[in-house]
Amino acid sequence: MTDEKHVYVPPPKDPPSYEEVALHSALNNSAPPNDGEQNETSMEEMEIIEPPSEDSSRFPLLRTKLAAIHEGWESACHSFEIRFASTFHRIPFQFLYLAVIATVIILASYYGYFDGVPAWRSVHHYGEDVLLNYIKGCDISDTRQQVMTLSSIPHLAGTVGDSSLLQMIMNRLYYEKGTIVDFREFYAYLNFPQLVSLSIDGDDSFHPSLIESYQVGGYDGVSIPTPATFGGSPSGFVNAPLVYANRGRIEDFEWLVNSGIYVESSIVLVRANQSDFALATANAEKYNASAILIFEDTYLTSLDNLNQVYPAGPYPSANSLYRGSVANHYYYVGDPLTPGWSAHEETNRISPKDANVLPSIVSIPITFNDGIELLKRLQGHGHLVKDSNWCQDLAPVLSEVWTGSKISSPGLEVNVLQDIEDKQKIINIMAQIDGYESDQILVVGAPRDSWCTGASDSSVGTSLLIDVISTFANMAQDLSWKPRRTIVFASWDARQFNAIGSTEFLEYWKESLEAKAVAYINVDVAVSGDTFTARTVPGLKKVIQRAFDVANEEDEMKAANIITDDFDYTSDLTSFLTFAGIPVVNLAFERNEENPTPMPFLGSCEDTVSWIDTFGSEYWENAARLGKIWSYLILFLANDPVVPYDLEDEINGVGEMLKRIPEIPGANALDLRKINEEFSELLESLIRFEDEIREWKSLMMHNSYTVSVKKHPELEGYNAKLARFERSFLDEAGLPGHEWYKHLIYGPNLRNSHSQLFPSIFDALLYGDVEAAQKEVKRIALALDRAHNEIRFA
């Protein structure tokens, strides 16, 4: 990172206190301990004993051998002088002098003498067991109390609450010695609701709940109103008939059209979970709807647990509002007006009309109760739906499901007034612990902002991030320790608005991070179940399992669930993986099918500590476990001499993914021979590369944590190749139709919100364009060739 872009400015060191000066003076003037007096006396006696003289009769045999060696040396020097003296006399002395100096400089530079650590001195690293024991001994702070503080007020990005939380965290981190703490500002497109209203023409009995009020703790009668809103929604006034479109998928809109129900110029009602808000909105816009109303149907999980509905238990009520972003992340994430470059205050921006991530239709979230009330108003209008995909799970709360129609449906009036800021300041908090290898960086992050109070949706992750920073800062201070690689910690702002904070950071530092970053570790919704789950690339599976196993020694858990083909592309890891090709990990405790616990109330003002408490102590115990696993993983990725990116796992994982290309609908028309050939060559290169690393380890790494970083240029070469390997699958031309995404293996797709392997092939075949799909096959083959060349000349 160049000097003019250096984010982290260390604060000036404080002068020593009087106590420190007095202690230093006392130590210098104190007498040595009694148990060392005998050793010191012996040393003094040894120092004054004179060495034996040349006439001494000691060691006669040794003296005879040394004399013979001396005579041989004298003879060799005399012979060399006779043969070559005349030649050297003809070379000017200055040239010989310069040649010697140049040789010394080249060798010194090669072995790192001019780098941060002298070549003659090993970089001291504590044994792994010492560092692990230190982390094990670190007490996690009272996470519940810390989360209660962090979630005490709503803190949407760009608001006063977010600013207060920022200051609170900055003040907390400034006390951590050994870290450099600073912040980085960006200026992004954000919207803030001023007015939201919804009514039915001629029906005064419909009173939707469009505002949630959060009761401020410790202040009786003081509450903060939070309107229903979606990030990215424009202002607008619409009066139009209502049409129901099930879950807002493409197939749902196609079914309506095939049934003679057209949604053009209508208000569409859909039920969708938070990950599908943006896709449902994009599909409604594609079919020319004028507005969209979205309700979450997670309340259906409460029907069998009505005695456990919050606040009596963890299940959602029918009156919860779930906010989210409707920015279409299929095209890109980050600031809508600066795609591909960082959003500084004076940078060039595109028009909001040209930002294809921003929808042009009005959208608002509504409660489950209000959604059902609107469906009841549609009964008798349009078509009676009998498709089980549309109505089966609604049967307990709705006798019939009708589509509604443009002709006969009741008219709705939707009014949304947004305060839209093109350049709203957002702030990432950064902390850094410098490592010995300044050319390698590990990035660690968690989002900070939330739609409301966000206890589970950001505050738990933020609390754990603070604890992790504290652990490593204290370890650096107490042990005078430095990690091998620099660790950059980040508290991201504006994650809820399409992952803006992390993306702008990545876009600003892209060139440097592509060259230096070994991995990015993300924690978002830290706990939503009881199974430790890591979503990552195949090359990091082993090191994640290793971190989990260490934590499992202290506190036995269920088996870890490590997933390598499914990412959330609305999260902060998106830009690192798909835009810059940096290996990523997302850590969390998630739900599983065996124990489908209720999901957190993401985006709702009911996402509070009191809701978390309905789970009992297990939630907080899992949060503490996650903090330990996170710390161990950071240690391994930042401190192992060889970057723990397992190339064999990575390549074998890619091979398994390649086998799934024929499973894509329409892929039987593709010629995949070139991909298979390139992958076979990649496997051959892998064998040679792994052999070289094994040979190096056997020769040099007798103690893996006491190895000179600068004595082994081979190690630097291996690590650089391992860190760059994931970048082989980037293509700067981008994916057709959403060129911001560069990774050919991972990315979003047009059809649904789920992660899609080889998305460009999927999208091309979705439209029946076999020729375009074959071009994507060729690009993937070229990426495999780049990967092969990356490790071929190890």
Swiss-Prot record:
<keyword id="KW-0812">Transmembrane</keyword>
<feature type="transmembrane region" description="Helical">
    <location>
        <begin position="91"/>
        <end position="111"/>
    </location>
</feature>
<dbReference type="Pfam" id="PF04253">
    <property type="entry name" value="TFR_dimer"/>
</dbReference>
<comment type="similarity">
    <text>Belongs to the peptidase M28 family. M28B subfamily.</text>
</comment>
<dbReference type="InterPro" id="IPR007365">
    <property type="entry name" value="TFR-like_dimer_dom"/>
</dbReference>
<dbReference type="InterPro" id="IPR046450">
    <property type="entry name" value="PA_dom_sf"/>
</dbReference>
<dbReference type="GO" id="GO:0000329">
    <property type="term" value="C:fungal-type vacuole membrane"/>
</dbReference>
<dbReference type="GO" id="GO:0004180">
    <property type="term" value="F:carboxypeptidase activity"/>
</dbReference>
<dbReference type="InterPro" id="IPR007484">
    <property type="entry name" value="Peptidase_M28"/>
</dbReference>
<dbReference type="InterPro" id="IPR039373">
    <property type="entry name" value="Peptidase_M28B"/>
</dbReference>
<keyword id="KW-0472">Membrane</keyword>
<feature type="region of interest" description="Disordered">
    <location>
        <begin position="1"/>
        <end position="56"/>
    </location>
</feature>
<keyword id="KW-1133">Transmembrane helix</keyword>
<protein>
    <recommendedName>
        <fullName>Inactive zinc metalloprotease C354.09c</fullName>
    </recommendedName>
</protein>
<dbReference type="GO" id="GO:0043328">
    <property type="term" value="P:protein transport to vacuole involved in ubiquitin-dependent protein catabolic process via the multivesicular body sorting pathway"/>
</dbReference>
<dbReference type="Pfam" id="PF04389">
    <property type="entry name" value="Peptidase_M28"/>
</dbReference>
<dbReference type="InterPro" id="IPR036757">
    <property type="entry name" value="TFR-like_dimer_dom_sf"/>
</dbReference>
